[in-house]
């Protein structure tokens, strides 16, 4: 028998420090990781002029690659449905 590992998509949270909505989204993602397989990458938009211009104060944004999944608030049902396609 092989030891196959399931693919775990990496979800990116575009965030900045001192952003309470960002902190809430990240905490919610950590809770979902208890039952769903995915990795989280947090990107501080203030470290990139391009990202700061793109998002400004319109954060947090949750994305998988170029696909935006949620903006401002985590949508657990929509994210669960999206991630079910990777099982």
Summary of predicted features, one role per range:
Residues 71-75:
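N-terminal, polar/charged subdomain of small-to-medium soluble alpha/beta proteins
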Residues 59-68:
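A short, hydrophobic beta-strand/beta-hairpin element that forms part of a small beta-sheet core
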Residues 78-87:
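Thiol-/selenol-based redox modules, centered on thioredoxin-like
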Residues 38-49:
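Thiol-based oxidoreductase modules, predominantly thioredoxin-like and allied folds used
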Residues 47-60:
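Short Fe-S-cluster ligation motifs
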Residues 2-31:
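Local sequence-structure signature of Cys/Sec-based thiol-disulfide redox active-site neighborhoods
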């Amino acid at each position: 028998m092989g030891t196959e590992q399931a693919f775990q998509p990496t979800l990116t949270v575009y965030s900045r420090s001192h952003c309470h909505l960002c902190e809430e989204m990240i905490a919610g993602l950590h809770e979902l990781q208890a039952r769903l397989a995915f990795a989280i990458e947090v990107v501080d938009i203030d470290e990139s002029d391009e990202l700061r211009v793109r998002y400004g104060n319109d954060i947090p944004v949750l994305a998988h690659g170029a696909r935006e999944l949620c903006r401002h608030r985590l949508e657990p049902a929509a994210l669960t449905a999206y991630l079910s396609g990777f099982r």
